[in-house]
Amino acid sequence: MDFVDFDSFSNDEITGEDNLPHPQPALSLPITSNIETIGKRISSLNTITRSLLKFEGTDEEEGESSSENASKENELAQKYAQMSLNFLKKEETQHGSDGKIANGVDGKSYNDFEHSKATLSTRLSRVLNDSLSETLLREIFSHLEDKYSSYDDSIDELIEPGVVGSMSRKKLRGKVENELIKNQSLVLKEYQPVIKQLKVVEDRLSKLNDLNKVTNDNIENKFKYSSEFNTKVKELNSEKRLINLKKNLLINFKAKFTLNEYEEFVLDSGDINDEFFTVLKKAEEINANCSILLSIENPQLGLKIMSKSNHLINRSVERIINFTNKTLSNLYSLNSKARLRTLHQCMRYLKNKLNYFSNVVNTFVDSRAKVLVDDFLSQIQGNLDSNGNVSTFKRRSSSISSETSSRPIYVSAHDPIRFIGDLLAYVHSLVVNESDTIISIFTFETSESEVEKKEFETIIKDIIDKILKSLVKPVKSKVTQIISAETKLSTSYSIFNLVELYSMMFTKQLSDTSEVSIALKSLVKASQDRLASIISNRLASIRTSNSAQLELNLDLQPPEWIIEFYSDLLPILDQTTTDTIFNFTAEENEEFMKLLVDEPIEIFFEHIGSNKIFESKKDQLILKHNFLDLILSKLLPITIVSDKVIEINEMINTLTQELTQLQLEAILKECGLYDYYNIVNMICPFSDDFFDTSIYEPIKENQLYNKSELLKINEIIQSYIPNALLDIQSSLLKLNPPSIVNEVTTNASLEFVKYYGKLSQINSAFLQETFTWSDFEIATLLGVDEDYTEFIKLVANSG
């Protein structure tokens, strides 16, 4: 706490009548932060003082730690009290008689006063603005209050402004300071052992400091002598590092941008092996790294190095190309694994240079293609001997590994099947041998990656296709010539089978997109077209042939040409195992079916129509029926033409219905009922589902419909019907299928009985007259009694 005295007895500066002390003027304290709580703090001053005094009393009982805090507080209080007394003295001096400051007091005293005032303001503001909590301030003042009460002094004397108050405060201050000194002494006693130990340590540290000083002096002296040496060593190390750097730069430059004499010799004249490609790779890297040298100010060095490296690289590439071409032109040299491995390295290198690689491949393809074509032509273009027979000759083997001659191809115009078989077998052997050769040459034992492996598989396929493409034109030309010249259906079919077989073999060996496979497929198509053409030409000649028309006679049997036609064709169809004939497409198969079935039927019907001997429609129907029945019997065992069998059955059913109708009309005419049949049908045709005699009442208006006419008809029926069945069967004797004869006879007779029975009901209704025989009796005489009985039951059940 700061002690502030309100009186001053400094008479040196103040003279006048008023010797009493005056209150200290107001101070401008910067206590804005505590202005709101200052009143509250002053009002609780007594409480704080009492708490402070109590707190001090408690501290005395607690021991040496509390006395130390009290000593510090007393010292601080004494300090601020002295400052307050100084300010009071200056205030008295300022307010002396006659106003010494106003009447010429020197400016120095006034300035000292202002300075003291500012100092006191600062000190007081520090105390009042100290960031102490209210609780702590309360305890401090309470302790102070308790301490004051212990001396039995009046509190009023302590706050008086006069001499008594000043003396009381000084007395209190002395007591507080005395107590503070005691407390501090107790604290200092605690540190006395430590101080003794520190003095011992001080002696030792002094010795160490002396030793350190001596050592430092020695080091400094030595450093002065060695500094020059160190400087020189440093310079030498720097120079050494620079030299090493230059040396490393030169070594690296030489390693990256130059080839030694041996490496140049390897590229220019050395053997092509692993070392050659290693040096070549280094030369290419040097050439690529020269771009760095070209970017400097003087690019001449880079240009010279690039020129030299380019020369070596070009020379090396030429050597690689020459080696590759020479090796591929003499494939016997590939028996050496080392040479084959070197060839693979060359091709792997050239693959990255497409223009060079393409030239090498094209050269190889041209040479192999020429060899294959020469071999093929040597087989085909043989010389005839003096007797005109085809001579045979040995062919040069197209197989690289074969040293023996193969079996020659016999070119014979009388055996085209054997010739084409031998020819295609020879071509297939060429394809297999050439494919194996190319694969063995261009397949690497150890590929660097799957991508490279796939790339060379594509290259192998392309090379094989290009080489074998040379055979396409001569093979296709020769086989097409033989196919076009052949006129026998069986021979053409055998050729077709051969070509189709080898087409599948070539497709399996090569691929669908290879030129050879495409050529064989075109030959298959040509043989298919030739088969269809042979059949079409044969039918065209039959269409215009007079002999074919003359084969038709009154015996109503099918002509011989249709038997001969199917006798050649059906064995071929019977051998077919594919879904379509000759493996045609669906559209082509449909067209061929029309050529096979529809066109012969059309030609036959034209011949019937143009032949005048068949004036009877019944004979025409029987002849057509017999013709279709013959075709049906030929085609029925062959499952591949089942659709056409169904169509022919439908045509036969149509003809059977027409023939049945003609036979019914013949029976009606023989019985004299044909006109009545027409009259009834004009009114309303008979129906098995519904019949009512009232519908036919208009028949009475017809002049022919009377009893006398019916009596005549009854007599005719009685005379004809007993022999009618024999007459019907005799008229159908030339109809070949017995089942059709029975069907026509039964259906015609049954229809007649139905008509007869219904007409009898009409007669009974409108003429009250009926025929002598009933419909069941007529059915019995015609042999259809069972069929008619079933019909009556069926009508009765449906009604």
From Swiss-Prot:
Organism encoding this protein: Scheffersomyces stipitis (strain ATCC 58785 / CBS 6054 / NBRC 10063 / NRRL Y-11545)
Membrane topology summary: Peripheral membrane protein
Family membership: Belongs to the COG6 family.
Protein name, entry field: Conserved oligomeric Golgi complex subunit 6
Keyword DNA damage set for record: no
Keywords: Golgi apparatus, Membrane, Protein transport, Transport
Main location: Golgi
UniProt key word Membrane: yes
